[in-house]
């Protein structure tokens, strides 16, 4: 019987097992703020490491970067964020609740069975016309009496220095991409990379979202994993398809089922004016389909904008053909928090097993890919009298992996605890271990056990981490 996955179950497990806690909880919390606990930080770091491994370490084309969160204000003027990075807002005149007009429209589309529910690029007039014609009432009070739609800039503004004037105005970056674009020439010069090549970055971004929600899916502070891939104009669609396939396979190789993800290509009416193509990889969350990964062919728009505003030359001289051109950019942009949440949802399972006296025993298990699991193994001495030997096993394995140690409670309860946090292997040290140098290795997914020489355990774990 298929388990019903709900966000309530996922959130409860995350809170109870130390994956994710509400932010500032002892002070009543802060709306839509989340802290990654001991297991959560290991898990999310593993997600980031997996992305870096595939998109940087294993790619001869790509290099890394870590740019500053605070940047010169003119960067955001050039990119268009100061003038145009905004959401369409409207208030209910009756109950004073505030909503994003485009989200009201998209929610209505979804509720009425639309295959593609998007209002991207719609004007204020188009949004209001749709809301009025379809009688989309206020979700809070049920009245149809809204203010006019107005734009609200999403960037967090602050000041650098001791005086709060326009000369000291800075923003918390709303995306990591612009830090890559402004460093394009420096990276190309110092690495001697030839086009095509890419620059990858993982980092925090901030958006003053009006309607955040669904746990860590949409938050005001979030982490991005972005690649800006620079290629010769005319080869961009070929590279666009290459990176689409790479992103898709990354998710499948780490355990996502194909029926739970889909590739949605943007229609012409959705495309930005500068884009040749854009596709989103979406995941089927308990609350519906949600975007994980956006892959966009941004042409030469970004580099040209920065060249225009900075006065710096952003052209590339091809050493083979002596051609000069501004490279086109393919951008696969992935939310670290979103994809981490998707992996948690995908892994969650409840299995009905026969317990004592024929009663049904429900086993909660997280089928995380071992590469993503917070702990790769747990060392479980059968008795506290075996602690010395168990410590030796722990000391050896912890040099290579993040492993847990647990000697409290029955062995069955310890197995269940590790199942619930996704630990792939439980390694039991028993009294026979002292005689034969073997341990019992239990597999999380099928619960099968095998006796293994202590010196062979490392190889078993290493093999499981491949993807």
From Swiss-Prot:
Its EC number is 6.1.1.14. Substrate binds at residues 100, 175, 222-226, 331-335. It is found in: Cytoplasm. It holds the Pfam family tRNA-synt_2b. ATP binds at residues 207-209, 217-222, 291-292, 335-338. It comes from the Bacteria. Belongs to the class-II aminoacyl-tRNA synthetase family. Homodimer. This is Glycine--tRNA ligase. It comes from Clostridium perfringens (strain 13 / Type A).
């Amino acid at each position: 019987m298929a388990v019903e996955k709900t966000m309530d179950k996922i959130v409860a497990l995350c809170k109870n097992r130390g994956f994710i806690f509400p932010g500032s909880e002892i002070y009543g919390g802060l709306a839509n703020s989340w802290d990654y606990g001991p297991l959560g930080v290991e898990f999310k770091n593993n997600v980031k490491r997996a992305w870096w491994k595939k998109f940087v370490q294993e790619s001869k084309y790509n290099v890394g970067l870590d740019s500053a969160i605070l940047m010169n204000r003119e960067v955001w003027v050039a990119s268009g964020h100061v003038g145009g990075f905004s959401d369409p807002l409207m208030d209910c005149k009756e109950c004073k609740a505030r909503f994003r007009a485009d989200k009201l429209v998209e929610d209505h589309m979804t509720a009425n069975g639309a295959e593609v529910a998007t209002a991207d690029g719609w004007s204020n007039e188009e949004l209001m016309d749709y809301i009025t014609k379809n009688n989309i009432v206020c979700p809070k009070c049920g009245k149809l009496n809204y203010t006019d739609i107005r734009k609200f800039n999403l960037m967090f503004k602050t000041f650098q220095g001791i005086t709060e004037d326009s000369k000291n105005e800075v923003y918390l970056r709303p995306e990591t991409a612009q830090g890559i674009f402004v460093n394009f020439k420096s990276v190309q010069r110092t690495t001697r990379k030839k086009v095509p090549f890419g620059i990858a970055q993982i980092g925090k971004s901030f958006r003053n979202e009006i309607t955040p929600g669904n746990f860590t899916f949409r938050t005001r502070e979030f982490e991005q994993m972005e690649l800006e891939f620079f290629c010769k104009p005319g080869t961009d669609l070929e590279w666009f398809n290459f990176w689409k396939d790479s992103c898709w396979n990354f998710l499948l190789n780490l355990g996502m089922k194909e029926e739970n993800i889909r590739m949605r290509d943007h229609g012409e009416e959705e495309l930005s004016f500068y884009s040749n193509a854009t596709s989103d990889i979406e995941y089927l969350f308990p609350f519906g389909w949600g975007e994980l990964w956006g892959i966009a062919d941004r042409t030469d728009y970004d580099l040209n904008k920065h060249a225009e505003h900075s006065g710096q030359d952003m052209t590339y001289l091809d050493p083979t053909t002596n051609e000069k051109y501004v490279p086109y950019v393919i951008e696969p942009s992935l939310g670290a928090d979103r994809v981490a949440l998707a992996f948690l949802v995908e892994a969650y399972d409840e299995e009905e097993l026969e317990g004592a006296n024929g009663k049904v025993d429900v086993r909660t298990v997280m089928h995380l890919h071992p590469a993503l699991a917070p702990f790769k193994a747990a060392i479980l001495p059968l008795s506290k009298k075996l602690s010395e030997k168990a410590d030796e096993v722990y000391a050896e394995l912890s040099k290579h992996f993040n492993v847990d140690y647990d000697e409290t409670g029955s062995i069955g309860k310890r197995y269940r605890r590790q199942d619930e946090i996704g630990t792939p292997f439980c390694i039991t040290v028993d009294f026979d271990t002292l005689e034969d140098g073997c341990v019992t290795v239990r597999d999380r997914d099928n619960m099968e056990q095998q006796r293994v020489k202590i010196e062979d355990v490392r190889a078993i774990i290493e093999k499981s981490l491949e993807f």
